[in-house]
Regions:
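C-terminal, surface-exposed recognition/capping segments
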Residues: 2-9, 166, 173-245
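Short, compositionally biased
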Residues: 2-164, 231-245
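Hydrophobic core segments of beta-strands in well-ordered, beta-rich domains
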Residues: 89, 168-171
Length: 245
């Protein structure tokens, strides 16, 4: 059977009512406003509230993030990293804490295999399981321990909106590796945020476990990944989140 073809111009001439009229400038603006959030890159995330009161989340290129935003009371949620179909919001600040108060079987992703650990993207799910497994002798759910600290972390604007407590987690190994690979760009964006702390040349905890007494640890100095770090050891903790309304 022959395939029938038709000129688009002829179809438009007969079906003009089916086409929504839009000014070229409006269409270009809409496309340009959205495309930056779809492409790989590093952005500063905020929930606007000063000029607009809708608390809408925005991803702003670092070169467009100016002091006047913060002087007007805007708060940066963190640094948005988009890469290869994954995205993370890296908190502006960090702390140093033990992973847990003792040996724990949390149900979070556990492996002693380095390659398997590097494929773990389930930081959010890991954190929820770590917190749920908290118990006497192996506390994990308070701000004194890595997962609990991340879960209680919060960044909000003047309306109390933003990335509130319960929306942050302890990154998995794969999430930490993505942060490490983009450390210089992330630190540049962090340098533009008032009160932010840059990623340091230190060991950072992952939510990926390697045993009941150990979890994975990533060095942001050279990318060394250690799977036998005792959970009682005090390491760097940097909460992460997602681009959320």
């Amino acid at each position: 059977m022959a395939i029938q073809t038709r000129k688009m111009s002829d179809w438009l001439a007969q079906n003009g009512a089916a086409i929504t009229a839009a000014a070229k400038t409006s269409m270009l603006k809409a496309v340009n406003d959205e495309v930056a959030q779809l492409q790989d890159g590093v952005f500063i995330m905020t929930h606007r509230w000063k000029t607009y009161t809708d608390d809408f989340p925005l991803a702003i290129e670092p070169r467009k993030w100016v002091a006047s935003y913060q002087n007007a009371g805007e708060i940066a949620d963190g640094v948005l990293l988009v890469e290869g179909g994954h995205h993370l919001v890296i908190a502006p600040t960090e702390t140093q804490l033990p992973w847990a108060g003792g040996n724990s079987d949390t149900g979070a992703f556990r492996t002693g295999d380095r390659l398997a650990a590097m494929q773990d993207w389930a930081g959010k799910d890991n954190t929820a399981k770590i917190i749920a497994a908290s118990k006497t002798g192996a506390v994990t759910n308070t701000e004194a321990y890595a997962a609990g600290f991340c879960n209680k972390y919060s960044r909000v604007n003047g309306n109390g909106k933003g990335l509130t407590a319960g929306r942050w987690w302890l990154p998995s190994v794969a999430e930490l590796m993505m942060i490490y690979a983009n450390k210089a760009k992330i630190n540049h964006a962090l340098s533009l945020i008032d009160g932010a702390q840059q990623l340091s040349e230190s060991w950072y905890w992952a939510s990926t476990e390697s045993g009941s007494s150990s979890a994975w640890f990533l060095s942001l100095t050279g990318g060394t990944l250690d799977g036998w770090s005792d959970k009682s050891y005090s390491g760097k903790v940097r909460p992460v989140s997602a681009f959320l309304r």
